[in-house]
Amino acid sequence: QVLSAGELEALRQMQLATVEELPEVSRSDQTQHRLRHLEALRAAGMEPYPLGGSLGSTSAPVLGVKDALRIFSSENIPDSEFIVSGRIRALRNHGGVLFATLIEGGETLQVVIERSLVGERPLSLASCNLDTGDIITVQGSYGASRNDTDSLIATSWHMASKSLHPIPFDSFTDPEARLRRRSTDLLVHPDQMQNLRLRTAVIKALRARLDAEGFLEVETPILHTVHGGASARPFRTYINAYGEDLTLRIAPELYLKRLVVGGSGPVYELGRDFRNEGADATHNPEFTVLEAYRPYADYVQMRELTERLIKDAAQAVFGSVSLPLGRKASSERVVRDVSGPWRVVSVCDALSEALGRRVDVQTDFEELLALAQQHGVRVHEGMGPGAIVEELYGELVEAHTVEPTFYTDFPAETSPLAAPHRSVPGLAERWDLVINGMEMGCAYSELADPLVQRERLTEQSLKAASGDLEAMEVDEDFLYALETGMPPTGGLGLGVD
């Protein structure tokens, strides 16, 4: 039924009346208290959320707390006024004087707002309406309080942003709450911000090394029509424009290999991958990965490149080729020198050492099943000897490795995109790098034979058809590219996070 203009207006008025009758959104007493302060500031003509660059006619730069402290600690402090902005950590009202402690990254600066310098009204506005967590901008000069604390003596102040929630500076420790409120976590635990800076340093170091070695950085699609490049469960979506089901990429590998076929030369991508699997301390549903491919290289050369990459990143972060190592929690690890050559050992040799007996992919299947049961390793239908060997390796070797170690020559059964080992049947030219019990990355001598690749992807698609949510699908476009001819290639993948 089509409503007339009058009926539409009547409906709108009824909706508005209904909204007005709804109870106010439930807010804490603290938030209600702060909202009243916000309204009072606006009523007095002070905007609680001003736009940047609205500090009047002054052209002086706005300093952070750390910048101001650095100036105040110098031998020759300028006589001129400063403009400093910061978040209020604490407030102390002493009648005609208000002391505000501003905080930035764990460092604090005392601000003195005194009636004789700012005037009665600005002091009253501050005393009655400022709360901890508010961000204020203060203009003033260097001075010292009666107890000789370096201070900014205010001549004027303005709101930069009103905080409607109290910040639990002394009590925000619950891990789940910290994950839910990341902005609050960063405010209360500013050391966490250092992780972002370290991440940036790592990414810059990775790029610098790859660029120096002649790699081309590219971007490949994130929305895929066929999921592949790794064995993992994808996120699924739908594109309305084309009426097609799509998946978020689980790896950029197959697109990067298309570029190698097309003559790109050495190529790499730093980007986000998505896997619809469990989440824990070492696995996130979305994560950043470096993948790189070098024509005419193999897994040995990619291993050497990976060692250079991580050592460069360590140098950028720690100022030396060192890494925090240890089996305990990350906070208890000890930074140790890793500048020497890293250990290289085959999966089967390492597993045999852990078991005290020789085990490999040729070991009797029933013996492997018994070993899996003995060590609490779950085996499900469809697993062959290679898959059991890799599961045993993960439980008995990888989890107990602290020092940087390259474990090489994995079972071919679990490495569908890797080339067969050139001298050992049943194995693939693949390695995993393990540090502190975690896989940090892997590399292959890439499988360039399109006929073998088709067989392996067909096997994977049959597993997918039988309900294996992690199995890859047959990507005909990728296979066509491979059939065009891909040069011998080495490829690596590193988890940046």
Go through each PLM region and give its residues.
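Class II aminoacyl-tRNA synthetase catalytic cores and aaRS-like
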Residues: Q1-D497
